[in-house]
């Protein structure tokens, strides 16, 4: 047993998990359950009453958090301590949205001042582009921006831009490219005019394979349309810490925005990586996005555990994963603009907490990061919700919905809300055999057939969910929501005693991918690797099966 599983608070939860009544009973015996098990902060309302939890459960979960020194770990992150111990780095994405008068020192430098300088530079750049002052090589204004990145430098900007579609200023179109598949960039470039297109290349090293390959292809396309190397500076900018490589490529040093080691890619949308967002929604709205996230930072850092929204959500996820063997967690967004959030939270959580050793290198003997997946309501109700209701696996769910729509057409939004709330009720309540049979009594079916169908219509219920509401989707509430999930991810990693801020599995994939690439482009037959890899490489070289 590891240190964590030996804790009395952990073992108390193990024992307690076997004695909880069905949620139906909890609701029937606790008339004030909704009021007692809901909270609000930072423009968000969280109903966590539809969880397998009593007041005793909550006390035991908070005891585990306290025994795991969660509060001191939260303070250590905000203070800039080196909590990413494998890479010897501070973890300070929170500094990206801190107010200008805040002082956070890393290696003797106030990084908040650096962040503010970068935000000012971003503002000037956004203004020059959206006002039409920035001209392309033929004197035309820029109409289209192509953002090239991968991982956090792609997914965050894309999903946030999509979510904030109602706030686009309309001056620019933005296109996102990540996959190294040539089809991706080829399709994006179709219909674009090189005279009015600007590329934003995001790579800390300016050498990430997929990003560099796509950027080189974009440059070849640009030059093939009649532009010259000297024109590159008017159509390419970079977010990178490798200034020399970027300038060698042809990018003006003044148009290179910084990245810092104390920000991981999946936490970087708040930095200059978010430049495409700012270009679409304007700098004022981008600052509102940061302000919403900062408000959640303050809540997380200063609120007691018992009413701390990220702590509550993180502890529930751990509760189901470690004590009920839940292997996945579903995120269901009842707002079309938020349809990309499940994929964003998937990267955030799975890249952070997909770990199997503790900070000190001990193998864990408990489950860590679950599979995060999901989609858009109500589409999922006609697909995978069936598994949620009657499948054998326990899959906790998060339902996310604004109370007011940006597009209040007819009865659409009230129907959307009825589906959202109805699903949470059905998951909690289920349907007993007697209830199913009673519904069939007027069907005219033979008794034997009624008994059979009733068995198939039984739903166990007791399926947990959280419901997160906001008045309306705005830059501020979106910032709060994303920061909520960032900190929820931190809470789980802190309890599990793992490093949520490295990604050695990703790094190994890059390394082996480069090794395979060398063999794919070599003239000789591949023989050095395992028989499967050799066989696949040689089939690719043949170009046929």
UniProtKB/Swiss-Prot annotation:
Active-site residues annotated for this sequence: 351 (proton donor), 382, 510
Keyword Isomerase belongs to the record: yes
Keywords: Cytoplasm, Gluconeogenesis, Glycolysis, Isomerase
GO cellular component, one term: cytosol
Pathway given in the UniProt record: Carbohydrate biosynthesis; gluconeogenesis; Carbohydrate degradation; glycolysis; D-glyceraldehyde 3-phosphate and glycerone phosphate from D-glucose: step 2/4
Pfam families given in the database record: PGI (PF00342)
Assigned EC number: 5.3.1.9
Enzyme type, top EC level: isomerase
Molecular function via GO: carbohydrate derivative binding; glucose-6-phosphate isomerase activity; monosaccharide binding
Reaction(s) this enzyme catalyzes, per UniProt: alpha-D-glucose 6-phosphate = beta-D-fructose 6-phosphate
Protein's cellular compartments: Cytoplasm
Family: Belongs to the GPI family.
Entry function: Catalyzes the reversible isomerization of glucose-6-phosphate to fructose-6-phosphate.
NCBIfam families (UniProt xref): PRK00179.1
Protein name: Glucose-6-phosphate isomerase
Organism: Shewanella pealeana (strain ATCC 700345 / ANG-SQ1)
Lineage: Bacteria, Pseudomonadati, Pseudomonadota, Gammaproteobacteria, Alteromonadales
Gene behind the chain: pgi
